[in-house]
Curated annotation (Swiss-Prot):
Region Disordered, annotated ranges: 93-151
Species name: Sus scrofa (Pig)
Keyword 4Fe-4S: no
Gene Ontology MF annotations: CCR chemokine receptor binding; CCR10 chemokine receptor binding; chemokine activity; chemokine receptor binding
Secreted is among the record's keywords: yes
Protein's name in the database: C-C motif chemokine 25
Record-linked Gene3D superfamilies: 2.40.50.40
Gene label: CCL25
Length: 151
């Protein structure tokens, strides 16, 4: 057999085999187990959620709650009461954030639009100070990583 013919056969075999291997090894970020229950204090810190359907390597229907600290996520059973409550909280929060706020006051467009003067002195924008993670919040965040296997 000629070497170029062997090289063509190997190339065809690798070309046909590589997509199948790539599809099997594709990384899907999905839940493989449910969390039993998450306290309301932790659940209200979630910034979004996503429904997971059964497809591909994700063989468990779930609701995934995403938390801002260190890309944490919590998987819940869609029928659980705490999951329904969390979805309702986030839906209401997103609905409230997306709705434009109208008031009876008229603001003028200018370099300081949106800043109201509170006193006769100079006005300063309100600054909020955020503290770093505390020891107890790290402990609570570590509780989010434990899960109970689904049915």
């Amino acid at each position: 057999m000629r070497p170029w013919l062997l090289a063509c056969l190997v190339a065809c075999f690798v070309g046909a085999w590589a997509p199948a291997i790539h599809a099997q090894g594709a990384f899907e970020d999905c839940c493989l187990a449910y969390h039993s229950h998450i306290k309301w204090r932790l659940l209200r810190r979630a910034h979004s959620y996503q429904r997971q359907d059964v497809s591909g390597s994700c063989n468990l229907p779930a609701v995934i709650f995403f938390f801002p600290q260190k890309d944490k996520m919590v998987c819940g059973k869609p029928g659980a009461k705490w999951v329904q409550f969390g979805m309702k909280i986030l839906d209401n929060r997103n609905k409230k954030d997306s709705k434009p706020h109208h008031s009876g006051r008229r603001f003028f467009q200018g370099p300081q639009s949106g800043v109201r003067k509170l006193s006769s002195g100079t006005s300063r924008p309100l600054l909020l100070k955020f503290s770093g993670p505390t020891r107890s919040s790290k402990r609570k965040a570590s509780l989010l990583t434990t899960a109970i296997p689904g049915p």
